[in-house]
Amino acid sequence: MNILSQTQILHLSIAILLFITTSSSSLSPSSSSPSLSPSPPSSSPSSAPPSSLSPSSPPPLSLSPSSPPPPPPSSSPLSSLSPSLSPSPPSSSPSSAPPSSLSPSSPPPLSLSPSSPPPPPPSSSPLSSLSPSSSSSTYSNQTNLDYIKTSCNITLYKTICYNSLSPYASTIRSNPQKLAVIALNLTLSSAKSASKFVKNISHGGGLTRLEVVAVADCVEEIGDSVTSLQDSIRELDSINYKDSAKFEMVMSDVETWVSAALTNDDTCMDGFSLVKTAVKDLVRRHVVEVARLTSNALALINMYASTQENFS
């Protein structure tokens, strides 16, 4: 073990030599290798390799964008962008674009302001114009109806009188002459209708001898009533109430003719006294209507005559 081979001794010697050589070369201050010397790169600022390989300078260059943001707030680039980011400048600045673009919000009130004035005029004028006419029309129509109702109270068939004349209230108003004339015209229309109906019965055939006689007499009587009513309307419609003598004479004639028409209606029905068939009921239905209207018309004529006589 204490004995080494020559080969081992040789290897050990070489190793020791190499170690010594390496140690001496690293500790030598006179080494001229510029690439391994740390002092020249840091001390020489003008050397290109240290500047390009220096790790400290690249970071400031790459981080330089972070430093500019603080200074720019006072610079113009941020002041030009401040309107879009900062809401206070647009509101404070009257010449800024946003307020002028929002200014249309004020025109709507201006455009709506004209719409508020129109409502007051229409509401006031239509109501003021319609209220007098509607109230006047309602009052006038009610007055006319009251006049007809009061006038019909003197008739024998009050309901028939009012129902037949009330549709003509606006024409009659409070005029007793028009009231009498319209009453006569309604009576004449009913008499013509009854005369036509009775004539159709006589032409129908199938009647008994008594029915034929009664129908023929009735046709004649109603015909006379129609004539009397027509004469009465003609005279009453053109009467001059200012001439009292003429007025009294005409009114006397009218009263006589209308009374005769009423008598004719009664005579018509008297002819069916011996008839017990349905024909009598049919004729009676029409003739009775004429007789009642004639009776009412005669009462209104008498009222008109007495009113004018008292006035004279």
Swiss-Prot record:
Location of this chain's protein in the cell: Secreted, Extracellular space, Apoplast
Matching CDD domains: PMEI-like_3
GO cellular component entries: apoplast
GO biological process: plant-type cell wall organization or biogenesis
Superkingdom in the source lineage: Eukaryota
Glycosylation sites noted in the Swiss-Prot or TrEMBL record: 141, 153, 185, 200
Purpose of the protein: Pectin methylesterase (PME) inhibitor involved in the maintenance of cell wall integrity in response to necrotrophic pathogens. Modulates PME activity and pectin methylesterification during infection by Botrytis cinerea and contributes to resistance against the pathogen.
Stated family: Belongs to the PMEI family.
Protein's name in the database: Pectinesterase inhibitor 10
UniProt organism field: Arabidopsis thaliana
Gene name tied to this protein: PMEI10
